[in-house]
Amino acid sequence: MPERTQAPVTLDIHQILSILPHRYPLVMVDRVTEITANKCIRGYKCVAYNEPWFQGHFPQRPIMPGVLILESLTQLGGILAYASDPFDATSNLMFFLGIDKAKFRHTVTPGDRLDLYAEVLHHRSNVWKLRGEASVDGTLCAEGEMLASIVDREP
């Protein structure tokens, strides 16, 4: 990955894939629209009907699983951590450690653009505590506080 002195304001899918270890079908952030290092990040996920989880959740009324909405927020938080304190994405991973205060308030369905927001609550060493919100058309769908840690890729 090329060296940089400042994180870009926006990231496309290719830049996201250079940071996140996730690949299809679990890349849950399509674009980052705003980054303020050590503070907050905004992005989105376009929710398509052909996502594999809609085959079983639920065929007659497809709804994005809440755990995947939280995964979207956690991935966005990982991108924020990288933009704030760059780590070697080829030898480190950001592991999700826990969630607090998770609430699911509205369904997310195929065709929705899931708008994502995360902010740093606390950061010390390799541990990050973040708060995230996911919304569709301005309606809050899910929120929670996530705890994550940067670890070596190889145990």
Curated annotation (Swiss-Prot):
One of its GO terms (biological process) is fatty acid biosynthetic process. CDD domains: FabZ. It is an enzyme of class 4 (lyase). One of its GO terms (cellular component) is cytoplasm. The active site is at H57. The keyword Cytoplasm applies. SUPFAM superfamilies: Thioesterase/thiol ester dehydrase-isomerase. It is found in: Cytoplasm. Its EC number is 4.2.1.59. One of its GO terms (molecular function) is (3R)-hydroxyacyl-[acyl-carrier-protein] dehydratase activity. Gene3D superfamilies: Hotdog Thioesterase. It catalyses: a (3R)-hydroxyacyl-[ACP] = a (2E)-enoyl-[ACP] + H2O. Keywords: Cytoplasm, Lipid A biosynthesis, Lipid biosynthesis, Lipid metabolism, Lyase. Involved in unsaturated fatty acids biosynthesis. Catalyzes the dehydration of short chain beta-hydroxyacyl-ACPs and long chain saturated and unsaturated beta-hydroxyacyl-ACPs. Belongs to the thioester dehydratase family. FabZ subfamily. This is 3-hydroxyacyl-[acyl-carrier-protein] dehydratase FabZ.
